[in-house]
Structures are given as C-alpha cells and as structure tokens.
Amino acid sequence: MYDVTSILQILPHRYPFLLVDRIIEIEEGKKAKGIKNVTINEPFFQGHFPGNPVMPGVLIVEAMAQVGAVAILSKEEFKGKTPFFAGIDKVRFKKVVRPGDVLLIETELISLKGYIGKAKATAYVEGEVVCEGELLFAIK
C-alpha cells in the first residue's frame, strides 16, 4: 500500500493534476489498485458543469493512467522515468462520476516491449464500472 507521500516519490504529477490518493494493492511492474477521492473542491468542477458537477471523462482516464504508472514506475528499471500517453483504445464511459464518489481503479499490464506498453484499466464507483479501456504508454 502506498499513501500520497509515497505516490509523490514515484509520479511526476503534482496538484492540481495528481489524480490518485492511495494505492491499496500493487504488484510492481504488473498491476495496481488505487483510489481517487472525488470532492467538490476539485478545480474542474467550477466549470464542468455549474450546478451539475460531473468529473470530466478525460480526467477519469488520466487517473487510471496514473494508477498504472505507479505500478510500472515502481519497477527498478523505470524508477525516475516519466510516463507518456501513446494511445487510448476501447475506452467506454458507463456512468458519471460526481463529488463524493470514490473511484476504485484497477490497472493491469497487458504487454511491455522495451519502453512501450499497454495496460487494461477499469474504474469503479460503489462496485459499478464507470469507465474502462486500454491505455498505451511510452516511458522516457
């Protein structure tokens, strides 16, 4: 398990773009489970949407990528590196995410060739899938 202090030592992301609060399970270099506590204090809720706050789908995908990045960057050979999106495939949004929700995010590495990889990611709220897809990444 990693708390936010440990996550900050692994990921290069910082406020307001750090979108993972805790890693609750990890198999370094292979898979991870993390949590994002969604609060009304998130800066994006000011404009998305006033009176009807909904977490932007692209930020759910980014949160999924950050959980996956913790798993990959925990691997000794990738420590200190920066992960970049190389592509996003088969992403589907099933439900909206609102303030007060807790995103449970699961990511698992599908393939890794050198510094290019693909992971399957799923985000849940209260046991229901809100988003799923495949994330392609490059590590530099």
Curated annotation (Swiss-Prot):
The keyword Metal-binding does not apply. Its EC number is 4.2.1.59. Keywords: Cytoplasm, Lipid A biosynthesis, Lipid biosynthesis, Lipid metabolism, Lyase. GO terms for molecular function: (3R)-hydroxyacyl-[acyl-carrier-protein] dehydratase activity. It catalyses: a (3R)-hydroxyacyl-[ACP] = a (2E)-enoyl-[ACP] + H2O. The active site is at H48. One of its GO terms (cellular component) is membrane. It is an enzyme of class 4 (lyase). It is found in: Cytoplasm. The keyword Lipid biosynthesis applies. One of its GO terms (biological process) is lipid A biosynthetic process. Involved in unsaturated fatty acids biosynthesis. Catalyzes the dehydration of short chain beta-hydroxyacyl-ACPs and long chain saturated and unsaturated beta-hydroxyacyl-ACPs. Belongs to the thioester dehydratase family. FabZ subfamily. HAMAP family: FabZ. This is 3-hydroxyacyl-[acyl-carrier-protein] dehydratase FabZ. The lineage of its organism: Bacteria, Bacillati, Bacillota, Bacillota incertae sedis, Caldicellulosiruptorales.
